[in-house]
Amino acid sequence: AYQYSRKAPEGIKPAENVNIVLCTIELNRSRPIRTDPSSQGFVNDISNWKKLTNNILIWDYIVQFRNYLDPFPNLHVLQPNIQFFSDSGVHMMFEQGSNRSLSEFHELRSYIMAKLLWNPDANADAIMNDFLNGFYGEAGPHLRKYIDQMRKALVESDGPLTFYGYPWDGYHTSLT
């Protein structure tokens, strides 16, 4: 359900063999969904759907789709978002990234998502370091520093991060 069709209906329940698919298409990717003021409508919609059914699937977007090579420093929200969905009783997830090595840190994102979907409470920092050091070798710590600097700049800017943004959107946020 995108935007206008995302709200739970009143006076009707889905049949047991129906899955409700809720998409995070319009959400900000710079802050965790649970604590982002602009995402509270989505939080409420999940809660309202949970009153009607346990068959909820989240379709989440985790890369910059307009420009795959654009830095998209959202790695820090992946775990809290998965934890939010799990805590909300949602156990079906589709995390859409790029389908091959076209996007920024595709392999890293895939590795993190695989680990966190299996165990939402796993140590995300250890998972990231394990991948960076294993995949990039001696460059791993330098890439971790880059990732942390991008995250820090984005968080300190308090700016949004949308998956249909433009490369220049980061000029005042993560690329400062």
Where are these regions (language model features)?
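Catalytic-core regions of glycoside hydrolase
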Residues: A1-N129, S174
